[in-house]
């Protein structure tokens, strides 16, 4: 949210998808749990109050009204500093929202009998803890906000640096935010 300098046009475009596609699909299939893989907010430093008001009244209230719950891990755009997850927009803006659980640290959750490892933005402060979590978390699925070497950040532009995909081979499925196009490995 807040893309293109808090553009109302972009916000309305996103909300059209949520209103016309996402929420109707969730309701039709009685889906009550959502996992967001980070970067809920576009900019790490600010969002304008008009867009923030609309996020609350048009998105968060819709979650609550329909008894839905969103598990939200932090992405790099959600944190103020690149080297820590401690100061983040999600906690500051939505920390009291009953419809959201925010994950600043790695954690395994269970949804309908499935253990899922959630891994927020990996930075210099939490790198060792994150690598240990990746290696030891007892879950077949990992959802993170990962910088992975050799993957397309956007179509045709490979990311140079980041973690090696080999580190995640023990998982049956790994899903990540951060990258702006769907990719298979």
Over which residues does each language-model region extend?
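His/Asp/Glu-rich metal-coordinating catalytic cores
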Residues: 33, 46-185
